Structures are given as structure tokens and as C-alpha cells.
Amino acid sequence: MDTFQVIILALIQGLTEFLPISSSAHLILPAQLLDWQDQGLSFDVAVNTGSLLAVVMYFRKELYSMFMAWTGSIASGKQTQESKLSWWIILATIPAVIVGFTAKGFIETYLRNIEVIAATTIIFGLLLWWADRMQRQGFNEFQVGWKKALVIGLAQAMALIPGTSRSGATITAALMLGLSREAAARFSFLMSVPVSLGAAILVTKDLLSSGQAIDYQALGLGIVVSFIAAYVCIHYFLKIISKMGMTPFVIYRLVLGAVLCGFIFL
């Protein structure tokens, strides 16, 4: 990959990773429009690491409080709202881990194609619109409980289907369960930490065992660009949804889905 490709693809990944619009739907566009080849494992390591660092940096205070409360609850047996939230995040991660390990080959072989991505982009966009429209109660993330956490975790596992969008699926589920827009987004972002960490570790392991030459320039540039893009994205996304809701992202998904359908049928 040349420098231009690294910057463009890292920007796309960073900007779309935490928006409910599907990063895979966007990463397929350069391949369709510009005939770019697969990004390679070095790039995958870079964008996973950059996205992880962005969400950890943005929520560093919350994550520190949660970690300290969680370790304290193990030692003392006493639960606080931060320790409960930590346990719910762990619980919500389990379905994606199970599905990821058992169905990764099937997903990569049969579902990573433009037809599936176009369909899921549109379908889950409509589900996001419906969930946002029906949202009324406005619970915060400290009121999730283990049952809601498990349901949101199942939605995250479903998001392994390309085009679904991890943040889109989890925010949709959280809104359906009565969380406020901001709480749904925060819970989704916090859920991304163990998932992104696991993904970064697995892709790094694949890279080291593949025997591929490591492109350190692409690796470093991809981390920096995806980190900056993801950090900015998180900050402004939380501001946008508090004022405008999910409608702009729903419209965008429908337009994007239509564009992808155009590549299929035209």
C-alpha cells in the first residue's frame, strides 16, 4: 500500500468505526471505485490499534474508575455502580467472542461480499430509525442490568455480519431497551474496548505468524491517522445525537446502501 492509500483507508476506518454506518461498507468502496487490493494484515493491526487507543483516551477517566471499582469488587465483594457497569461490559462481550471464534471462517467466506453489505446497510439502518423513533424511557448506562447487557451483547455478535455496524447494532439494541441516545452511545463505545483489544491481539498474532514483511511506515501512519479520526468522531458523534438524534445516520445508511446496490445491478 502506498501512503495515499494508507491515509484514505485509515481515515475511513477511524471515522466509521464508531459511527452507526458500517466501516466494512465504506472500506469496500475504494475496492469498487479504485480497484484497490486487500489492505493486508499490517493495515488491520494499525486501524484496530488506533481505534482502541482513541476510545481508551476519550473515556480514560470512566475506564479508570470502572477498572478500579471492578478490581475492588473482586477483592471486597462489594459492588458499586462502576463495578456493575464493568461486569455488564464483560458479559456483553461474551457473545461476540463465541460467535467470532466459531463462525469467523463462515463469515469471511460467505458473508463478506457487496450483496450482503448492501442489504445489511439498508436493513439495519431502518432498524436504527425505528429504535430511535420509539425510544422514550431514557435510562443511563448505570441502569442497564445484566439482562439488557446480554441482549446488547447479542446485537454486537450479530454485527460480525459485514455491513451491520457494531456501533449501529449495539446502539439500536440499547435504544430498543430504553436507554437514552447518549447512554446507548456511551455503552456501545465502552463495549468496544474489550472487542477492539481482542481484535488487535488476534490480528497482530496473525501478522506475526503469517511470515509477511511488516510495513512499519504503513503501520505507524495507520495508527496515527485512525486514532485522530476515531477520537474526533467519538467527540462530535455524542454532540450530534444529543441534538439531532440518529436521523442523519439513518439517511446516510440508506443512501450508501442504494449506492452499493447500484454497483450490484448496474
Swiss-Prot record:
The chain crosses the membrane at residues 1-21, 39-59, 87-107, 111-131, 144-164, 183-203, 218-238, 246-266. It catalyses: di-trans,octa-cis-undecaprenyl diphosphate + H2O = di-trans,octa-cis-undecaprenyl phosphate + phosphate + H(+). One of its GO terms (cellular component) is plasma membrane. Keywords: Antibiotic resistance, Cell inner membrane, Cell membrane, Cell shape, Cell wall biogenesis/degradation, Hydrolase, Membrane, Peptidoglycan synthesis, Transmembrane, Transmembrane helix. It is a multi-pass membrane protein. It is found in: Cell inner membrane. InterPro entries: UppP. GO terms for molecular function: undecaprenyl-diphosphatase activity. It holds the Pfam family BacA. Its EC number is 3.6.1.27. GO terms for biological process: cell wall organization; peptidoglycan biosynthetic process; regulation of cell shape; response to antibiotic. Catalyzes the dephosphorylation of undecaprenyl diphosphate (UPP). Confers resistance to bacitracin. Belongs to the UppP family. Bacitracin is thought to be involved in the inhibition of peptidoglycan synthesis by sequestering undecaprenyl diphosphate, thereby reducing the pool of lipid carrier available. PANTHER family: UNDECAPRENYL-DIPHOSPHATASE. This is Undecaprenyl-diphosphatase. The lineage of its organism: Bacteria, Pseudomonadati, Pseudomonadota, Gammaproteobacteria, Alteromonadales. The gene is uppP.
